[in-house]
Amino acid sequence: MTSQTLEKIVAPHTGKPDELLVVAEKLMDRYRAIPTAALKLMQQQLGLTSTEIQSILSFYHYPVTDTPVRCHVEVCCALSCHLQSADNVLQHICRAFAAEPDQVTDDGRLLVARVDCLSDCDRAPAVHINGQRVSASDLDALVKHIKQALA
């Protein structure tokens, strides 16, 4: 990760604070995390306070770390997913990888995040691995998908 790469991602949105989420999503696509150097750059370029930036990043469970997360698993816990046992899915994944919800693992490779909505209510409980929809109907298969993403 270079400052030039970060600049290329953030600069097109200079002076557009309403595009914070767009910038964050681009950083997540590239690094699967928000590099700490990007925080200051977003603050300067977008004209937002660090509190405003942190509130958005924490709401979307975007990890701020200089070690790119290899695998970002999102488990929807909104009402329709909750009613379809999203908590069991989350617990199964966390047990399988000795992970804590909403925290990057000690080795920096995995984040299992509880999210408020993935807009996949018809596929409840909804799970995304690195932004891709996956089925949570077979928990063992889900663990295999995550292992493949970590490989």
Q: Which sequence ranges carry the predicted segments?
A:
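Signature of N-terminal electron-transfer/Fe-S-associated modules in redox systems
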Residues: 1-151
